[in-house]
Regions:
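Long, low-complexity intrinsically disordered regions
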Residues: 1-209
């Protein structure tokens, strides 16, 4: 994705290119084949979802063709890990590769050790600690429970992105809010977060994450 004259231009393959990824299932298979893959084009030519799909259906909300929609579907399946893993931007990591990926990003630290060595912020610790009692949380729930806001902690988006970059948090799903009185969904889809360990329990990847 490049900005040319104020207009965002998507890269991609021709519609009839035999190497084009055509479905979200094919994309999962490709991620498992290569190990990890950013969503958008970057400084490494050919190393992104964008480089392997058509540029015709981005943000059309078509589950059959829209790669932006595919990321929601794939996160929901849990078959690969999704989050802001690459230069603070979105991407995927296979469950087989995730332990090595996370170990590298964490410099070998689990979060408790990182905190003890004063390498983690108190804001990051507050977020990670939430998952000792919660299997998953909407992003707005994390924000509220930790006390981010005008009169409280600052830069929630930056902190939660740092935790994803370090492999401590992943995006489990995208869901709408539910009204308390009747459970009816409303509004935009919102990211739902969890830890890699809890994600592994959900999908049965006990030996992989």
């Amino acid at each position: 994705m490049a900005n040319e004259g104020g207009e965002w231009i998507m890269r991609g393959l021709a519609w009839d290119d035999p190497f084009r990824i055509r479905t979200w299932r094919e994309l999962i298979n490709y991620i498992n084949q290569v190990g990890f893959l950013p969503l958008f084009a970057n400084e490494v030519p050919g190393f992104s979802v964008e480089d392997h799909v058509s540029n015709l259906f981005w943000w059309t909300d078509d589950p059959e063709q829209d790669p932006w929609k595919w990321r929601e579907i794939i996160a929901h399946t849990g078959e690969v890990a999704y989050g802001k893993f690459f230069n603070r931007k979105a991407g995927f990591v296979s469950l087989k590769w995730f332990p090595a990926f996370a170990n590298y990003r964490r410099d070998g630290y689990d979060f408790d050790a990182r905190w003890e060595d004063e390498l983690a912020s108190h804001r990051a610790k507050k977020i990670v600690d939430l998952f000792e009692e919660n299997e998953e949380l909407y992003s707005f729930e994390c924000k509220k429970k930790v006390g981010f806001g005008k009169e409280g902690e600052k830069n929630f988006d930056g902190v939660i992105t740092d935790l994803q970059m370090q492999g401590y948090i992943v995006v489990r799903d995208f869901r709408k809010r539910k009204r308390k009185k009747d459970g009816v969904e409303y509004g935009w889809l919102i990211s739902v977060h969890t830890t890699p360990a809890l994600h592994a329990l959900r999908v049965g990847a006990f030996d992989r994450i």
